[in-house]
Amino acid sequence: MKIKSLIAASLAVVVSTAAFGQSQSFKFGKWTEIQNSILKELNRSYVDSLPVDRIERAGINAMLESLDPYTVYIPEEENEDLMMMINKSYGGIGALIYKPEKDGNVIINEPYKGSPAEKHGLSCGDEIMEIDGQSTHGLTSQECSDRMKGKPGTTVKFKVLKVRSKEVVDIIVTRERIHLPDIEYAGMLNDTTGYIYQSGFTENVSGELRNAFLKLKGQGMKKLVLDLRGNGGGLMSEAVGIVSLFVPKGSMVVSSKGQAAGTEMHYKTTSEPLDTEIPIIVMVDSGSASSSEIVTGALQDLDRATVMGTRTFGKGLVQSIRPLPYNGQLKVTTAKYYTPSGRCVQAIDYSHRNEDGSVGYIPDSLTHEFKTAHGRTVRDGGGITPDVTIEGHDYSRLTYSLVYSGIIQEYALDYVREHADADEDFHLADKDWDGFVAFAKTKEFDYRSSAKTYFDRMKKELEKDGLSKNMSAELDALQKALEMDKE
């Protein structure tokens, strides 16, 4: 009887699974047929000419946005952007540009070292007046950037107003494959402490980090600070490669698991480490996501590093690239990943998110405890919680306004033009600061201090309650003080 019961139960599972599969297939077939019928009917009957590309793209985006923020459709024309995301390379001249005003010229902000821009004499502050015969007036910074990019080996012609000589010259630049390194800085903080800032996880960043580590080791490094703040992640394979540098061969780094067959994977280190003894601090914040969290979580779970900063973003999802017809691609979430202790850093749901998308407060009752290699308690449910919490510096709203308005950058470029022959070791004097203040006052930018925002809100509430007349003198004095503070 027991055998018969087991057979009956097994058959029930098989039948129900098959029925579910058929139900899902029917739903997909029905949905596809309805969608195609709607498009055909619109094309035949709609009162105006049908913007097919626009409505199809809107439909695709709406469908994918209902799943998660990371599953996206990539049309053929955006493949170059995908390559930039994967390997941080593109075909171009190798320079950061800046456009202070839409009707002005685009300005070279920084030519990369060894880039075609630098080789052909483009300097910081040079104004690009024309690109291939087209004026940059009226073009956005992005439109100018797009015109500078192209297939390596092709050329682009610029009409340039040189910042130093004030001469207008024609320059023809041959585009090259530009690679932007993820290791943006590596140096010594003191005689024994090395510091490495890593901004991404594109191809071969583990090799870049290895080289930077060996260079600092040669300079006497005895302790390492690895800064992953603001690092939004990238390739999982590079995260595994970085952990491999600091833990014994064969150590578990991360595992992934999804619903589809073949998505459960376990990733261990496969090479001999560089150094398993050097003390490491990993710096993180709410901008540290994905592969950054894999590295941080693994080094924390293996008790190989001390994590400092603020809680990480909380993106524990794995994306894969799938080819689509007409050279399009689908970046689709296929699995969740888990640290060596078994934690998933993905936020429990999207309701526990801050405005910037990072994980918000989650009560311990909704999370689970896990143990590190040495028995320390860590928790899941959203991001990696640092061993030592250190809040970042909170800049004033005025500072943010000046930075994001471009006023500081614009003044710096003007300063370069006026002081083209300045020594490399120059220092800003008080008169330079006064010049910046005067320059900023000539620019219109949106700035309201937090205090002014709260004051206006309080004043409205007092007016509603009929109390503002009794406090008019105090309110006027406070408003005057706030205006003086803004000045």
What do the PLM-derived regions correspond to, one by one?
Residues 20-31, 35-52, 75, 107-111, ...:
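Cleft-lining beta-strand/loop regions that shape enzyme active-site pockets
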Residues 125-127:
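Structural motif
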Residues 1-26:
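Bacterial Sec-dependent N-terminal signal peptides
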Residues 291, 303-304, 310, 314-373, ...:
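Polar, glycine-rich mid-to-C-terminal structural blocks
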Residues 131-132, 381:
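Residue-level recognition of conserved beta-strand edge/terminus positions
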Residues 344-351, 355-487:
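Conserved functional hotspot residues or short segments at active or partner-binding sites
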Residues 47-82:
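N-terminal, post-signal-peptide region of Sec/Tat-exported proteins
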Residues 70-110:
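PDZ/PDZ-like peptide-tail recognition elements
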